Amino acid sequence: MAIVKCKPTSPGRRHVVKIVNQELYKGKPFAALLDSKSKSGGRNNNGRITTRHIGGGHKQHYRIVDFKRDKDGIPAKVERLEYDPNRTANIALVLYADGERRYILAPKGLKAGDAIASGADAAIKVGNTLPMRNIPVGSTVHAVEMKPGKGAQLARSAGTFIQILAREGNYVTLRLRSGEVRKVLAECRATIGEVGNSEHMLRQLGKAGANRWRGIRPTVRGMAMNPVDHPHGGGEGRNKGMQPVSPWGQKAKGFKTRKNKRTDKYIVRRRNK
């Protein structure tokens, strides 16, 4: 993994910082694990914008990643590491002993030729997936399930990890990267190690067009709009004249928006603000 600062041959290249990984496969992805990916432009089925700042971007194929890791007792070998345009982490193509191939998230330290396994009796080794009741307290894990069998939902981005703090009865206590401490059923699965490509945070796109390639449109401040477009718009000078709100009038600072009271009992400590 190398961090490359581009030479200022043009204004758009002057501030570009790239992450170069020589271990990534340079060929085409495995065709059987690709799916089509249509762009919505942030619109719903009525054609109305439901998510702002989305539109355009390069055409992409979706890589079908195995988040369940449910092939228990069947050893697998890592064939190669690949780039995935749909996520910040890299992915690994693994070949199971029964001949099936699957994509998984590539943990830090995993390389081509390594052996991995899944199941309750799997070894405590980077890349192996097993129920958290079988993982020692204090271990670092990623790709953590929130419900048994549902598939990984927590700690899937580049460089993220979760630490197992305690095990009490049917639950384990986890500390997330956000600082939140929460309980999850001990039967939920997790993968040993942290997600790879942790240098992703050091990259610099260098120009607005690089964001457009990724399907991200500009974000305009409400104060720069007209009153018809945003509550902060209009007025003389640079004064919003009110408490900061969203384009639809909801308070933007200090207003609690969490609605799922049913799962509050599993949160031991809220995330760091």
Curated annotation (Swiss-Prot):
Biased composition range(s): Polar residues: 39-49
Similarity comment text for this entry: Belongs to the universal ribosomal protein uL2 family.
Gene Ontology terms, MF aspect: rRNA binding; structural constituent of ribosome; transferase activity
One annotated Gene Ontology cellular component of this protein: large ribosomal subunit
Location of region: Disordered: 35-54, 222-273
Domain of life: Bacteria
Keywords from the named record: Ribonucleoprotein, Ribosomal protein, RNA-binding, rRNA-binding
One annotated GO biological process: cytoplasmic translation
Composition bias type Basic and acidic residues, residue spans: 229-239
Protein name, entry field: Large ribosomal subunit protein uL2
HAMAP family hit by this protein: Ribosomal_uL2_B
Record's keyword annotation contains Ribonucleoprotein: yes
Source species of the chain: Aeromonas salmonicida (strain A449)
Gene symbol of the encoding locus: rplB
